[in-house]
Amino acid sequence: MNTGVQYYRAPFPEMEYWEQDFKNIRNAGLNTVQLWVLWGWVESTPGKFDFSDYDRLVELAEKNNLQVVLSSIAEIQPMWIHREVPGSEMIDRFGKKVISTIRHECNFGLTPGGCTDNPGVQERMKLFLESCAKHYVDCPNLHGWDLWNELRWNIQADELVCFCPHTIEEFRNFLKQRYGSLDGLNEAWKRRYIDWQDVMPGKAPDRPYSEMMAWQDFITYRANAHGAWRYSVMRNIDKVHTMTAHGASPSIGYSGDQQTYPIDRGNDWELAKGMDGIGCSSFPVWFNIDDAEFGSRIEMVNAAANGKHIWLSELQGGRAGIGFDLTGEVSPEQQQRWLWNGIACGADTILFWCWRDEVFGRESGNFGLYGNDEYSAERIKAMSESGKIISENSSLIDNYKPDSAQVGILFSPDSYYLAWAQEGSALKMQKAIDGYARALVKHSIASTFIESEHLENLDRFKFIILPRVVALGKEAEEKLLSFVENGGTLLVESECAAFDKAGLYRYPEKRFLNRLGIREAGRRQLITPVEFTIGGKTLSLGCDQWLTPFAIGENAPAEVFARYKNEILAARYSCGKGSVIALGSYFGNSYLETENSDFEQMMYSFAAEAKVERTFEMLTNDFIYVKSGSSEGRQMLFCFFPDSEKVCRLRLNRADFNGSYTDILSGNIIKADNGFLEFKSLHRNLAVLVENK
């Protein structure tokens, strides 16, 4: 288990602090430092690579028994890039050259720089990456590489990019690969193009969906390919060390805005396939991320990693702030929750941002774990305590795996692309996913995330949820139909897969659910809340956007949950060996706004009906976040207590279990009574229980 801090973003901190800082970092219980190796800094003169400051830092790290993560920051380009590669500027959607500048939080180097589809820029970048790998491949304390920081490539472009001739040519090549020919494209898009030169990217939202969705899809593909390219360049030289990349958030959380497309930084599922793992940044106080959301966030990364390395590549070190605005302080209790939650979710490398407060630009005076705020000394003390516990239990933690989930929540990039093509944001789609994930966490029902182009091994699930999945491809539809017919339970919301991958609307009789005898009757005006009856209980549920009741057809519902006037609004349908729960509106979005306990109860009932097996059932009144897993044949329970609840009571699914657990944080021993556990937190509102053998 590697726990560490980001330390150096050249040229800060200055050399006078290095030696003592590295001693303090090791004394704080941390074992790793991360260094930003900036292309613009290292190759400030074309063809001359100066690693002297990094060499000194790597040497000091080894002296203090610290491992090193090197972040190859190729996206901060040299100031000379446009002189050496004329015409390499990115082009925005209005045909204007993008003027690159020094980035707002980095002291030297251009952003966004030259377009990486330009062969000249790519060749220069390759030389930098190769130089980094050759220089440090034999470094004895090198832990690994973070190949692409927050997957950034269009920061400070100030507009949607890139529309340069190289990128547009690659876009057309992408379409040729997908559709085979112009005739194939015309058939899919219902067009009459006669020349590929006429096929252009989508320019703006609220225009025809087909080219806008295809362009966004290409931009994601392009980022995936660039990440794989960076990996191949480095892997050709360094055959040993772990190489990952990380986004500012998981790809599910990247819904786009006026200057960015959704998922334009790449799709974590594809990025992880092309590397040794994947990671993400998390600043919980800054962005008001609580235990439940943090756990879901890291599970998104875990799901995409698919058994590969999971890195918490930037975890909030100290108080955040931008410019003259401050956010809340980071207490040691909060920070330790994130650390142990990350471990509970399967992370094997956790790096805090950063050691000292920043000193440049908008981030000045903030973010330091060892920063100048009132909690700094307490954070260091708490980190030292945890570092000792992690070291003493290193084998246990290194071999830990979270429990597998039997509930899958579907992420459909096509639905994100469709939403952005209309509204310039896919936030509604993101919030729908977040809503269902949160409701399941609140009932301690383990869930994970599946991506619509990576639907392998669906038989591991008993229950799959499609939150606001309005666009879907045929291959995904076929796999979901097989899942239901083979005994799975599928939950769908309004107008599920109403649009195809080209953004063309399909009438209800043309949608894949019609093959199961489930057909919507059309859109109705929104009325909210809606009254449900489930298991003899009446529930009041908020919904969103519109109502789409279901027509009465060949497949009569096995159970009706809600009606709109005389029409069926929500029902369960028997389909083959499985079933479909069809909801005629968007309920996850409404839940995320209100956290209505009736929605949580509905999801609890649906999971139980689907025979989802649970490791434990929580018996306390207030929500206690618990994550379960195992290591070396022993069950582990990570428990995160709120201030309002001092005692955790839960029932294991091992009714006859009368063994015991040790809380490795406090040393407390807890005895089970026929599968029932009751215990308190004796350490910072946390408990990490390990089954005794």
What role is predicted for each listed range?
Residues 246-435, 522-527, 534, 540-542, ...:
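Hydrophobic targeting/anchoring helices
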Residues 92-294, 300:
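Polysaccharide-binding and catalytic clefts of secreted carbohydrate-active enzymes
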Residues 459, 467-693:
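A conserved amphipathic helix/loop scaffold
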Residues 437-457:
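A short, well-structured beta->alpha microelement
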Residues 12-27, 125-131, 257-271, 331-339, ...:
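Short, acidic/polar
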Residues 3-14, 36-52, 106-126, 151, ...:
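The substrate-binding groove and active-site-proximal loops of carbohydrate-active enzymes
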Residues 18-27, 31-101, 130-133, 224, ...:
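Aromatic-lined substrate-binding rim segments of carbohydrate-active enzymes
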Residues 5, 25, 33, 61, ...:
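Conserved, mostly hydrophobic/aromatic
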